[in-house]
């Protein structure tokens, strides 16, 4: 039976695209909406509606254009730095992680909502290792925009002698001199790798173990890293964000990998060349009475199964092969 997600995908996907795009555009307007003409809620709604019928990459592109226009309204020099950053990010993104657009969009959004820890855990659960490149792009983008916001007075000052050079230096320093960004990059990339490795292991409750280890590593790493860097006042935010991220991660597990380990079957069968040892864990949405397990043991059953498969493939009656 087709699951609800597959059955209503034609409706669910546009809604998800619209919601993600609208959230991204509203956060852009709220934090760096320096160009007032494009920084209104109606404009954000219209653009989000357009993004709902476009590939996810369309939202990434439109968001990039909005950011560049806002940067231009603040300062031409900052806009140039942002443009160079976007070019480098697009090269990295399209080269290594072209199918992980949601990572680029959702990472800055989660930072804005103070739940960034869910991103490396969620991507480690649902994606492959190369998705770390989209995660990196999202982290770099967030810290750049956050740095611009914190220094908007300096960057948007009246042009004076050597002011242009000074603005470029300040803008670049949001990336090159940001030790907190490097800390977050290291911890989140390692977290993604840890979660990915654990959830691939052949152990019971692999996803739950991966979530717990990932969240704990992030929380401890961020608190310890902030202490080393002399950053104070973030411990409570980190702990609360970690708890919320953990809850969201378990919701992801329920939606995408909900297994019933109490009904685990261990099967053994063989063919002419190999012995097979199989561990079968049914999905929790399948009722116990509906479960059908075929066991292979002995040459007679193997012959019968081979005959049955052949009959099915040839679309003939199995009795004709007796």
What annotation goes with each model-predicted range?
Residues 2-4:
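Short, small-residue-biased leader/transition segments that mark boundaries at the very start
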Residues 9-14, 23-26, 226-279:
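Alpha-helical transmembrane segments of multi-pass integral membrane proteins
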Residues 10-64, 70-71:
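Hydrophobic transmembrane alpha-helices
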Residues 24-32, 50, 122, 126, ...:
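Alpha-helical membrane-inserting segments
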Residues 35-40, 70-84, 178-186:
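Structural signature of hydrophobic alpha-helical transmembrane segments
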Residues 49, 62-136:
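Membrane-interface helix-loop-helix junctions at boundaries between adjacent transmembrane segments
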Residues 110-111, 119-233, 238-242:
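Generic multipass alpha-helical transmembrane bundles of integral membrane proteins
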Residues 259-309:
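Short, highly charged, low-complexity non-transmembrane loops/tails of multi-pass membrane proteins
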């Amino acid at each position: 039976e087709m699951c609800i997600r597959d059955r209503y995908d034609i409706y669910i996907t546009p809604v998800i695209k619209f919601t993600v795009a609208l959230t991204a555009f509203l956060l852009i307007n709220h934090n760096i909406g320096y160009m007032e003409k494009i920084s209104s809620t109606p404009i954000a709604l219209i653009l989000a509606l357009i993004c709902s019928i476009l590939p996810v990459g369309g939202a990434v592109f439109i968001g990039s254009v909005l950011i560049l226009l806002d940067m231009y309204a603040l300062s031409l020099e900052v806009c140039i730095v942002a443009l160079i950053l976007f070019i480098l990010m697009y090269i990295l993104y399209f080269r290594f992680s072209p199918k992980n657009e949601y990572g680029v969009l959702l990472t800055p959004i989660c930072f804005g909502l103070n739940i960034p820890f869910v991103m490396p855990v969620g991507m480690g659960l649902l994606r492959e290792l190369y998705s770390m490149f989209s995660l990196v792009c999202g982290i770099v983008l967030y810290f750049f925009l956050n740095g611009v916001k914190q220094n908007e007075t300096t960057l948007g000052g009246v042009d004076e002698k050597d002011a242009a050079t000074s603005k470029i230096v300040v803008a670049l320093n949001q990336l090159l001199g940001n030790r907190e960004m490097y800390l977050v990059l290291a911890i989140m990339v390692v977290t993604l790798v840890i979660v990915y490795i654990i959830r691939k292991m052949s152990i019971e409750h692999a996803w739950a173990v991966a979530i717990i280890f990932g969240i704990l590593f992030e929380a401890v790493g961020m608190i310890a890293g902030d202490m080393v860097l002399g950053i104070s006042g973030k411990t409570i935010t980190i702990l609360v964000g970690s708890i919320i991220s953990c809850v969201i991660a378990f919701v992801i597990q329920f939606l995408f990998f909900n297994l019933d380990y109490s009904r685990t079957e261990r099967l053994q069968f063989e063919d002419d060349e190999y012995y097979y040892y199989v561990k079968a864990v049914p999905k929790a949405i399948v009722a116990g009475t509906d479960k059908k397990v075929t066991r292979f043991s002995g040459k007679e059953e193997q012959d019968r199964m081979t005959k049955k498969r052949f009959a099915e493939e040839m679309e003939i009656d199995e009795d004709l092969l007796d």
